[in-house]
Design a protein with these regions (language model features):
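Catalytic Walker B motif of ABC-type/P-loop ATPase nucleotide-binding domains
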Residues: 181-184
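ABC ATPase NBD coupling module
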Residues: 34, 88-104, 133, 205-207, ...
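Short coil-to-helix segment of the ABC ATPase nucleotide-binding domain corresponding to the Q-loop/switch region
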Residues: 116-123
Length: 272
């Protein structure tokens, strides 16, 4: 992969992220599933433009519930969820497709169409929002070059490795350059070496100005990327920390140290 783009100075990033309406806001949000299981309980958080945020915590803590609420796959039981100032509970059904055009989603299991080529899988994301053929022919090769798959346009998903399939998933999510990218366990099915490449790619997308929210169990990634960490437990936010670790009291491994070098990140979360 080509070197990561030069990152803005920290003070420029702070000004960019603190100005204007948050990209994501949860205001005292609770979600109770049928049967009484509590997915989230009185969760409040704000995520600014251009931030990179990890959602961490044990299985069932509420990470995926947050992602699904932001996609409007689920409805909150109580509270308000806003994306760029627009309330999701108050949003008419007819406006939901427009909302989803501005959100890219990367899943753990890729969710590729098995009977379509790499090119067609990515093009489909543009077809469903009504882009014309000329635009599709321009955008799809560009995004496949970005993710390192320019030679795989005509391959089918079953001809690709897991890492390559996830790159197709990322290309599909980002081909329309949405302001918000949601990633639900993006390295969950990948080995450590492949995971480095996937996180390099997501990090590179974030540095274009896209807000990135990653729900993950991947301790090594979280520890050495040192981005904002929001920890959930039993549906509640128990920690919200800038430049955080997966678990603040644990040391880092040799793999995590090498990962930090691969990503070009310095000691306090800034590029080397």
């Amino acid at each position: 992969m080509a070197p990561l783009a030069t990152r803005p100075a920290p003070e420029a990033q702070d000004a960019r992220r603190s100005s204007g309406v948050p990209v994501v806001e949860f205001d005292d949000v609770s979600k109770v599933y049928p049967g009484g299981h509590v997915g989230l309980e009185q969760v409040s958080m704000k995520i600014g433009r251009g931030e990179f945020v990890f959602l961490v915590g044990p299985t069932g803590c509420g990470k995926s519930t947050c992602i699904r609420l932001l996609m409007k796959e689920l409805e909150a039981t109580e509270g308000d969820i806003l994306i760029s100032g627009h309330s999701l509970p108050e949003m008419p059904r007819r406006k939901v497709p427009r909302l989803r055009r501005n959100i890219g989603v990367v899943f753990q299991d890729y969710k590729l169409l098995p009977n379509r080529t790499v090119y067609a899988n990515v093009a489909y994301a543009l077809e469903v929002i009504g882009e014309n053929r000329q635009t599709i022919r321009r955008k799809v090769p560009d995004i496949l070059r970005l993710v390192g798959l320019s030679t795989k346009l005509h391959n089918y998903p079953d001809e690709l490795s897991g890492g390559e399939q996830q790159r197709v998933s990322i290309a599909r999510a980002f081909v329309n350059h949405p302001p918000l990218l949601l990633c639900d366990e993006p390295t969950g099915n990948l080995d450590p070496e492949t995971s480095i490449g996937i996180m390099q790619l997501i990090y590179r997308i974030n540095r274009t100005g896209t807000t990135v929210v990653v729900a993950t169990h991947d301790k090594e990634m979280v520890d050495k990327m040192r981005r904002r960490v929001i920890e959930l437990r039993e549906g509640r936010v128990i920690r919200d920390q800038q430049s955080g670790l997966y678990r603040p009291d644990e040391s880092t491994s040799e793999f995590a140290v090498r990962l930090r070098g691969e990503l070009g990140i310095g000691v306090e979360g800034h590029p080397n």
